[in-house]
């Protein structure tokens, strides 16, 4: 599998599981929320569109203005085939994520390592989540770690692992510690010894660029995904070295213990 277009085509053809034309998106909904963690100076604003199909959910973040709330009315009850072919990209990714999650739920997937995030405050849960993500990095002290999609606790977790973060985000210009953040991901992809990328890159199509560049340079790629966690999983061992998959409901929407799933690509013999 080379890119998300090939994955989408495989799903539509029924090569990956049931025919999407036979499956229905029971519920399509969206979430818009803000978060400012204690001690931070950044308010994170996120929008997600979500698809419920059978026993699974699929999710994709989107930028303001990309998806209108009316889509919840118009798309609920549609076939997955229709959404995968005709919907705006964020909804297509959410539908594909729901489809792949139904075919192979994270809780049942071979190779998935469940990690329990403890009950507690947003800060406690964010620190635990980002430590779990950074724990997927296999790096030497001082390694340059490209981070595409910047959240302050993850920057701190990478540093704790001994990495030197190279930061890229489309909406953030500095961290709470004053680290510069570029909006040009090629500055990061061309120099990093390892890359950590958010699943949100699936929303705007930049995931394929990140994937291809990491393959070309033969550098490890760790994906942390609420957006498209099952979509990113499809590239495990094909450019993605490791994955932290967090299916809906996400950790920020609960104060109780929740589970994310870590995957590592199996090395070739």
Q: What annotation goes with each model-predicted range?
A:
Residues 1-152, 258:
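Electropositive, gly/pro-rich neighborhoods at or near active sites that engage anionic ligands
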Residues 162-175:
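NAD(P)-binding Rossmann-fold cofactor-contacting core
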Residues 179-191:
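Short acidic low-complexity segments
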Residues 220-269:
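C-terminal functional extensions of proteins
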